[in-house]
Curated annotation (Swiss-Prot):
It is a multi-pass membrane protein. GO terms for biological process: lipoprotein biosynthetic process. It is found in: Cell inner membrane. The gene is lnt. This is Apolipoprotein N-acyltransferase. GO terms for cellular component: plasma membrane. It is an enzyme of class 2 (transferase). Pathway: Protein modification; lipoprotein biosynthesis (N-acyl transfer). PROSITE patterns: CN_HYDROLASE. Residues 245-494 form the CN hydrolase domain.
Length: 532
């Protein structure tokens, strides 16, 4: 039955092959949040393998033509995957549809079309190393792992919905990322998902199926072993109590001058709210990204109001736009920042967002694109300016938090050595742009995995959710649902040392890629000697 199905898929040609690849990619989206149907990967990836088998089997095409046919299959798979997984980005443009609706096709179709090029590249690389049976599955895993790694930094990077997340729907299955990293998880996921393609036979097919089963069991077993040694989820004697404020301000209200006071009062009111019975008095209070609707340096009354709201010894970490006056009356610069404010209403420190969102917070190639009207996409005059370095924010009692603002949390190993000595990751964000769509759930999952990857607990304050405190095993110690209004009160979990310490992330990635490459090439050479 499987052989018959595979044969039919392999024989598809032209638009039928493209449609099958597109639908297979779209089906693979079910492996990502909020669906987390990881078994969908065992359908979509074998189909992709068979489609590439069909492209390679063309006897009427030369080597270059077959390579391009494989790339075309990969592109259609990627286009289906990214269209179905990222369509919600377009909802941000509908908040002010009169001004931004024109850009909807670029967001919903243009971005997926560009990102699909990475999967076209993955298919091309796999084709270069393709061999019968197990060899093509290894080549497949290598090609996709390499493409996913490139997606983390090419053109500033956009590693959203990396395939590795499909293998980590729950904390039990997140623990391996601390050992092999997110690129390693992507390679593992692709290899295991694609392994059913070996049920049709081929060189070392049984070995490949056995290896996939072993890797899957090792992945689960390592997670179970790690969690069995983990401390209690909530430490009732924790050294630091944290409150996250989630105001759920509608995006249309955020920059309405008439609503600024109401927004600010809502934040202050939630800050002053007494803890529920059994919950600790907070030492640190966190507001979401750009929560403060004022420029603090020029609004001393707002700082005074914050100081009055904080109890003795409390510290507020709040997202706000920071203005830096231009020299000699020049244009000011604006930063997306986190402020640390003490109980006297004094600004203790600030941290600026380093990794800005292209076309959302700044305009790449501005001089070239200004004539196209894209400058209007950026809210602040001239857009945001990127911070120069990421540094820890001193909080209290010698503890410090590493700031990740908004989508900085999607980048694996974004912290690097800077995480050394920090007590936690603080991630402030505003996902109200995207409403009740898959976007906020996908964003949260990626931040959740950062806690496991870096060995640091996560404090995540989101304007409309999902706000949560996550321990270093990926377990949620307190949270608020999407669009809820309220606070999360919980003790801060303890950090733990990352599995490999804190070497540069690329070292781990390169070792994994070289291992896969060596295995693929070695299997090709061995097969040629034995079977030819």
């Amino acid at each position: 039955m499987i052989a018959r199905l595979a044969g039919r898929i392999i024989l598809l040609n032209g638009w039928r092959r493209a449609l099958a690849a597109f639908l297979s990619g779209a089906f693979a989206t079910l492996t990502q949040p909020p669906f987390d149907i990881f078994v969908a990967g065992f359908v979509s990836f074998p189909v992709l393998v068979w489609l590439i088998d069909g492209a390679i089997a063309r006897t009427d095409a030369g080597p270059l033509r077959r390579l391009l046919l494989a790339a075309k299959v990969g592109w259609w798979f990627g286009f289906g995957y990214f269209v179905s997984g990222l369509w919600w980005i377009g909802t941000a443009l509908l908040v002010d549809a009169d001004q931004f609706a024109w850009a909807l096709p670029l967001a919903v179709l243009g971005l997926p079309a560009f990102l699909a090029l990475f999967y076209a590249f993955a298919a091309m690389i796999a084709r270069l190393l393709w061999s019968d049976g197990l060899g093509r599955i290894l080549a497949f895993a290598f090609g996709f792992a390499l493409a996913e790694w490139l997606r983390t930094f090419i053109f500033t990077g956009f590693p959203w919905n990396l395939i590795g997340y499909a293998a980590m729907p729950v904390p039990l299955l997140m623990q391996s990322v601390a050992v092999i990293g997110l690129v390693g998880m992507s390679a593992l996921a692709v290899f295991v998902f694609a392994a059913p393609a070996l049920l049709t036979g081929g060189h070392f097919a049984r070995t490949g199926i056995g290896l996939a089963i072993f890797l899957a069991l090792a992945h689960v077993g390592f997670g179970a072993w790690t969690l069995s040694r983990a401390p209690a989820i909530v430490d009732e004697n924790g050294p630091l109590a944290v409150r996250i404020v989630q105001p759920s301000i509608a995006q249309a209200m955020k920059w309405d001058n008439a609503e600024r006071r109401a927004i600010f009062d809502k934040l202050v009111g939630l800050t002053e709210e007494a803890p529920a019975e059994g919950k600790p008095r907070p030492d640190v209070i966190v507001w979401p990204e750009t929560a403060i609707p004022y420029i603090l340096e020029s609004t001393p009354q707002a700082l005074a109001h914050i100081g009055d709201a904080l109890q003795e010894g409390q510290v507020l970490l709040a997202g706000a736009v920071r203005e830096e006056k231009g020299a000699d009356g020049g244009e000011p610069r604006y930063y997306n920042s986190i402020y640390t404010i003490d109980d006297r209403g004094r600004i203790v420190s600030t941290a600026d967002k380093v990794h800005l969102v292209p076309f959302g917070e700044y305009l790449p190639f501005e001089s070239f694109l200004r004539g196209l009207g894209l400058q209007e996409v950026v809210e602040m005059p001239g857009g945001f300016t990127a911070g120069t370095t990421r540094h820890a924010l001193a909080v209290k009692d010698g503890r410090s938090f590493l700031p990740l603002i908004c989508y900085e949390a999607i980048f694996p190993d974004e912290l690097g050595y800077e995480g050394a000595g920090a007590s936690a990751i603080i991630n402030v964000t505003n996902d109200a742009w995207y409403g009740d769509t898959p976007g906020p759930y996908q964003h949260f999952r990626q931040a959740q995995v950062r806690a496991v990857e870096q060995g640091l607990p996560l404090i995540r304050a989101a304007n409309n959710g999902l706000s949560a405190i996550v321990d270093t095993y990926g377990r949620i110690t307190g949270s608020l649902a999407l669009d809820a209004v309220g606070v999360v009160d919980s003790y801060l979990p303890s950090p733990r040392d990352p599995f490999w310490g804190r070497p540069p992330g690329w070292i781990q990635t390169v070792l994994i890629l070289l291992t896969l490459l060596a295995a693929s090439v070695g299997l090709i050479l061995y097969s040629r000697r034995r079977f030819h």
